[in-house]
Regions:
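N-terminal entry module detector
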Residues: 19, 46-47, 61-63
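Generic secondary-structure boundary/loop-capping signal
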Residues: 2, 67, 74-76, 106, ...
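Glycine-rich oxoanion-binding loops at beta->alpha junctions
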Residues: 1-37, 77-89
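A short acidic, glycine/proline-enriched capping/turn motif at secondary-structure boundaries
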Residues: 4-8, 44-45, 67
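Short, conserved acidic/polar surface loops in the N-terminal third of protein domains
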Residues: 9-13, 48-52, 71-73
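Acidic/polar active-site rim loop that often engages polyanionic ligands
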Residues: 62-75, 98-99, 123-124
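Accessory alpha-helical/coil subdomains and C-terminal extensions
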Residues: 28-30, 39-41, 47-51, 58, ...
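Short, small-residue-rich loop/turn micro-motifs
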Residues: 3, 56, 64-66
Length: 176
């Protein structure tokens, strides 16, 4: 695994040298008499494929993202699996949250799109769902938790997409 345009090599002292192996990659492609490079991947992989395309390599890019945020598609590769895994986790969190009377939080993928959080949260009976597309007010989240407790439900399940953010603030992941 590596980036052929910026491949990192380490010497015995731990120093890093960055080398460009793109020409060698194209030479090997031609030596093997290949017709086309099929690339299945996300943003980074397809950007890399585009660099090869710009150098004259015939490329077909097939987008893959579990975020389900590609225009013109109903579902993307990996999305339904991600939702199923999140639903399985929510089933387990329900049991623990209810028996121990706790607030349980499940963070799922979704830097810019909250589809996984939304679908898994609805299917998995989450009480609160936070997504990047709709900034939230922390006070409202706390209010919902307290209302549930006052109403006889001493536990809450929250699903948070990784890109969810409070109104007027950056996403939590931007601080890391």
């Amino acid at each position: 695994k590596g980036h052929p345009f910026e491949y990192r090599e380490f010497d015995k002292e731990g120093r890093v040298t960055i080398r460009d192996y793109s020409k060698q990659t194209i030479e090997n492609f031609n030596k093997l008499k290949l017709d086309c490079l099929f690339v299945l991947g996300g943003d980074g992989t397809l950007q890399l494929a585009h660099q090869f395309f710009e150098l004259g390599l015939p490329v077909i890019g097939i987008p893959k993202t579990i975020d389900n945020d590609l225009v013109g598609t109903d579902y993307t590769f990996g999305y339904q699996t991600a939702v199923q895994v999140a639903c399985d986790a929510l089933d387990r969190l329900h049991t623990t949250g209810e028996s121990h009377q706790r607030v349980m939080i499940l963070e799922v993928m979704g830097r810019d799109a909250g589809w996984i959080a939304l679908e898994a949260g609805l299917a998995g009976r989450a009480h609160i769902i936070l997504i990047p597309e709709i900034p939230y007010q922390l006070e409202k989240v706390l209010e919902k938790i307290h209302l549930r407790k006052e109403g006889g439900s001493p536990f809450s399940i929250i699903v948070v997409a990784e890109g969810a953010k409070e109104i007027g603030k950056d996403a939590i992941t931007s601080e890391l």
